[in-house]
Structures are given as structure tokens and as C-alpha cells.
Amino acid sequence: ARSRQLLEMIERDYDFLSFSEAAKFMNFSEPYFSRYFKQQAGLSFSRYLNIVRTERALDLIKTDESLTMSEVAKQSGFNTIRNFNRIIKEITGYAPNQLPAGYSLDIRSACVGQEHFDPTLESTVLLPSSD
């Protein structure tokens, strides 16, 4: 139950939530939380948070063409435009300003990235769509 609350909190507070705050929310030490999250989700907390932030950024890019990339970065929780550009390219394969029209994030590919992700793990949690 607490794990589900954490995932809901990440979805809601992605723009300012930190690793330390998430560990504290779970009442875990940071090293234990790191292992726990990776075991439960199949990827690290930071990778998961970056995927959530990337989804938000892509939504903003699609729905509000008046926003600059700096505004999109800030509103989607990235602390610098450089970090925003790096993470978006790492997850999507495209620079934010070079995304193809109608681009849609493939979550499975995003989760794989540089880490092992096995969606068949018993501990893998599917999140409901925020649509």
C-alpha cells in the first residue's frame, strides 16, 4: 500500500520530489530504499523519475506550442536545460526540439535504457494511465 502511495506521489509531485524525500516517505534509509525501489520497479528511482518527467515534457511539447524548451524543462521538473536535453535524448533518442511530429514515448524502451528491465517480474507494478 505504501509503495503504491509512493508511485502516486511521484506521478503527482514529479517536479520537485527528491530521492531523499521518497526514501523518507517510505521510512527507509537511502541505501535500502535504492535497493528496494530497483527490486520492486525493475529500474532505479532516478530512471523512473526521469521517465515520468519526460512523459510530462512530451505532453507539454504536444499541447502547448507557445512554451519555450526552457519553460517545458522547468514545468516538467528538470533543474537545468542541459539536464533536460540530455535526459530527453537519452530516453527518446531525439533532442527535444527534434522530436518527430506525433512522437509517442515507448515506455518499454524507455525503461530498458541502460538498465535491465523485466516486465514479467512478479514485483513489477503497472501504473494506471494519467489520461
Question: What residue spans do the PLM features occupy?
Answer:
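A short, Lys/Arg-enriched amphipathic alpha-helix from helix-turn-helix/homeodomain DNA-binding modules
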Residues: 1-17, 23-26, 47-67
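…primarily DNA-binding HTH/wHTH and HhH modules…
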Residues: 62, 75, 86-131
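Basic/polar phosphate-binding segments, predominantly the helix-turn-helix DNA-binding elements
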Residues: 16, 20-52, 73-98
